[in-house]
C-alpha cells in the first residue's frame, strides 16, 4: 500500500513569508478508494509568527477573509486555545511525515513554498525531499472536469480541503488507469 500525504494551509497572505493560520494534512493511498486517514490539523500562533518570526500579513488577504462566511472566519480567526508555536507545528508535521512516499499540495508554488520558508525561519530542514513533491492542481486540470466541484462541501478549512483533494487524486488516478507508483 502506498502512503501519500496531502497538505493544505490557510494563511494571511500569498507570499512565502505569510503567517500560517491553519495547517491540515491527511494520508491516503492514491491507488485505491480507501478513505484518507491519519489527519493532522494545527492552528498556528499568529502573534508569534508575526512578532518573533517576522512573517507577513497581507491587507488584501485579510479583506478576502472578511468576505468569507462567518463559520469559516470563526474557524480561522476564533479565539482557539489550541494554537501552537512554530516549533510545535513543525515538530508535529515532521512526525506526521514519517513514512510518506510522496507529498501533495494544491499547486507547486503556494503551500510548499510557504512551508519551506517557515522551516527556514525556524532553522530546520523540511521533512521531504524535492523529488517527493506532487501537485494536485496540475493533475486535476487534466481531468475532463475539476473533480473537486462534484464532491467538495466545505471550503477554506485546511483539513477538509486535504480530504477532498486526496479523494480527487484517487478519482484522477482511477480515471487515468494509474495502478502503480511510477
PLM features: what roles do these ranges have?
Residues 92-95, 113, 117, 141, ...:
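Residue-level signal for well-ordered alpha-helical scaffold segments within enzymatic catalytic domains
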Amino acid at each position: 500500500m502506498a502512503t501519500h500525504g496531502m497538505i493544505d494551509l490557510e494563511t494571511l497572505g500569498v507570499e512565502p513569508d505569510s503567517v500560517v493560520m491553519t495547517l491540515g494534512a491527511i494520508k491516503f493511498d492514491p491507488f485505491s478508494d480507501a478513505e484518507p486517514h491519519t489527519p493532522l490539523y494545527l492552528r498556528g500562533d499568529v502573534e508569534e509568527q508575526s512578532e518573533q518570526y517576522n512573517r507577513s500579513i497581507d491587507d488584501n488577504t485579510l479583506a478576502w477573509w472578511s468576505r468569507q462566511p462567518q463559520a469559516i472566519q470563526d474557524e480561522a480567526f476564533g479565539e482557539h486555545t489550541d494554537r501552537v508555536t512554530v516549533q510545535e507545528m513543525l515538530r508535529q508535521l515532521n512526525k506526521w511525515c514519517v513514512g510518506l512516499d510522496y507529498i501533495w499540495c494544491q499547486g507547486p508554488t503556494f503551500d510548499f513554498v510557504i512551508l519551506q520558508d517557515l522551516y527556514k525561519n525556524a532553522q530546520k530542514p523540511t521533512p521531504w525531499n524535492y523529488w517527493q513533491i506532487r501537485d494536485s492542481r496540475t493533475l486535476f486540470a487534466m481531468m475532463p472536469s475539476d473533480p473537486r466541484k462534484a464532491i467538495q462541501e466545505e471550503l477554506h478549512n485546511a483539513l477538509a480541503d486535504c480530504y477532498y483533494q486526496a479523494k480527487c487524486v484517487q478519482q484522477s488516478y482511477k480515471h487515468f488507469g494509474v495502478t502503480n507508483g511510477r
